[in-house]
Amino acid sequence: MAADCPAAGREPGAWRVQEEAGSRTLWETACVDVRDSANPVLVGARRWLARVNARHPWNHNEHFHGWILRNLPARRRAAVDVGCGTGVLAGKLAPHFARVTGIDADEGMAAAAGARLAQDPRVSIRHCRFEQFAAEAGDGQTDLITMVAVLHHLDLEDTLARIPGLLAPGGRLLVVGLARADSLPDLAADLISATANPVMGLIRHPRPARQAGGPAPGQPVMPVRDPATTLAEITAAATARLPGATVRRRLFFRYTLRWDKPPVTAPPPGSRNPATTR
């Protein structure tokens, strides 16, 4: 969901490091001061970053669509885009799959996606919650499930627990998500991202925008929620629920998660299935 882009205007609280034993390291203090300090130089730098980002906006989530398209599963019958927003990713997946389903809990988002993709018979859009969809479609026939900036809107443990039942053997889950900064590596990645963000904006959107970023006239506003779970918590949940999952910290305030459901392997010739042997 494009609105979940912290960029340089993110709330200072997301950058705070909790004190341990009543003291902070020099690095921790620096991280806090960069975001919260009333120093005129730092205040000016933050305002400059905000102005540059506003003049040269770009979509953090769509930036990772290429990663998704480069990691499609071998079998491509059915794909489900959870939290499809206005349907941009669902439209990009359509040429690669026999059918694509986009779901969104927000009525305005689902309506916008439906209007965008109304002429594509390969794509269907549903206005429903993920839990409802999973309960109705848990038949293990989906080859790809994508979630872009949506997992932090859902219950982490419950959502990950439902994935194996939805995916076909050999199916794949691809997540681009947001996590709460809670460690020095998190803060370092966020500081680098905040610095690189305007550079990427200049590259991808060199012509200054005439107006501040936001939805186009008549377009619904993306639902926004700050992430509550840390990358360490997400990794632990994925390890428990989806053995073999790969979680990686990325630039531009994102992480990626990839998991492949194990394929069904045929037993060797002459072997017996212990569950059915009498």
Task: For each feature predicted by the language model, list its residue ranges.
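Class I SAM-dependent methyltransferase SAM/SAH-binding core
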Residues: 86-132
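Short glycine-dipeptide loop
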Residues: 167-172
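A conserved beta-strand element that flanks and buttresses the S-adenosyl-L-methionine
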Residues: 146
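Short alpha-helix
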Residues: 224-243
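A short, conserved alpha-helix within the catalytic core of class I
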Residues: 154-163
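Conserved class I S-adenosyl-L-methionine
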Residues: 77-85, 174-203
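Conserved alpha-helix/loop element of class I SAM-dependent methyltransferases that forms part
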Residues: 59-77
